[in-house]
């Protein structure tokens, strides 16, 4: 079988990494969701021993229905979490003390999928549109308010059933996840049914790495070590996508997460594109001030933020 030898090699690598005795500083990282290729750089950094080499004993603890990543961060159960920029900014606006220590997704994977052709975001006026219950949905909601559009937002958990059943006119989706699900559900989507936010002037950064302000100030060494090792992980992913898929599938099996290689291949391919800055064509792993300002503007004008958040407040408190 194609996977057998690779899995054996990966298991051996993980065993060797776990056997390193001089990594003493234990920290916990929590992704946004269950195990999937969206977090490949972290899995690789763990499996290949990059965290151990940096002097860290990293535990990857995925969120549950009763314990989200941000809840774990607030309780001190996790020191590092992945958050999208939009909800992170809303939380800071509400008084939470968060620091962006690494921005790895430089582009937006958010899109609108519609039953009818879309000319622009304004085409959603008067429509029923599915949205995620939390997170990135705040951006299009704010944009709709800014443009004075009459959109009925219908919350969904994580599936595409509302759209497939015809209960809604359109739905928000991530190009690396829900778009694939819709295609696998038999939806024959034409180009004019797909509206990518990044193609219509709203290309905001998404997934980044966050810590609390207190942890940032008292554990700068650990923060720097974790960031550098994670960047090394993502760079390895970009250079070895096929081997990365095997590592991702291994972590999914270990956590009891169900998926298939084809779905994770799609996700990894799309996520690798999001790592690249749209103007420089490079992976910078830093929060782009221009993208940050655009996000600030949309969220403020759409009433999500009470006042603008400064770049320094976000990255260097």
Predicted segments — roles?
Residues 1-4:
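N-terminal secretory signal peptides that target proteins for export/translocation
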Residues 7-17:
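Sec-dependent N-terminal signal peptides
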Residues 18-23:
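Sec/Tat signal peptide C-region and signal peptidase I cleavage site
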Residues 25-165, 169-174, 196, 203:
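Short, glycine-/small- and polar/acidic-enriched structural segments
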Residues 86-87, 158-162, 168-257:
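Pocket-lining segment of extracytoplasmic ligand-binding domains
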Residues 218-304:
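Secondary-structure end/capping motifs
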Residues 300-317:
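Long, low-complexity C-terminal extensions of enzymes
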């Amino acid at each position: 079988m194609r996977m057998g030898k690779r899995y054996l090699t990966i298991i051996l690598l993980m065993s060797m990494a776990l056997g390193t005795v001089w990594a003493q500083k234990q920290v916990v990282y929590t992704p946004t969701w269950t195990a999937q290729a969206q977090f490949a750089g972290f899995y690789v950094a763990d499996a290949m021993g990059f965290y151990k080499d940096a002097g860290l004993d990293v535990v990857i603890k995925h969120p549950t229905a009763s314990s989200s990543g941000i809840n774990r961060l607030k309780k001190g159960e996790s020191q590092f979490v992945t958050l999208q920029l939009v909800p992170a900014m809303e939380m800071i606006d509400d008084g939470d003390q968060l620091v962006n220590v690494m921005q790895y997704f430089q582009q937006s994977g958010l899109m609108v999928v519609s039953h009818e052709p879309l000319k622009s975001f304004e085409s959603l006026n008067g429509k029923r549109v599915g949205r995620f219950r939390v997170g990135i949905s705040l951006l299009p909601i704010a944009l709709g308010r800014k443009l004075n559009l009459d959109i009925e937002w219908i919350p969904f958990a994580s599936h595409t059933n509302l759209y497939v059943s015809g209960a809604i006119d359109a739905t928000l989706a991530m190009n690396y996840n829900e778009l694939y699900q819709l295609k696998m559900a038999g939806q024959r989507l034409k180009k004019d049914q797909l509206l990518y936010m990044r193609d219509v002037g709203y290309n905001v950064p998404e997934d980044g790495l966050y810590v609390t302000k207190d942890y940032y100030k008292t554990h700068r060494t650990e923060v720097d070590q974790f960031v550098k090792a994670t960047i090394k992980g993502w760079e390895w992913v970009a250079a070895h996508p096929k081997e990365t898929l095997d590592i991702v599938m291994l972590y999914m099996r270990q956590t009891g997460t169900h998926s298939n290689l084809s779905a994770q291949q799609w996700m990894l391919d799309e996520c690798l594109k999001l790592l690249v800055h749209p103007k420089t064509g490079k992976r910078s792993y830093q929060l782009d001030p221009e993208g940050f300002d655009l996000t600030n503007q949309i969220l403020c004008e759409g009433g999500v933020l009470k006042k603008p958040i400064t770049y320094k407040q976000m990255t260097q408190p």
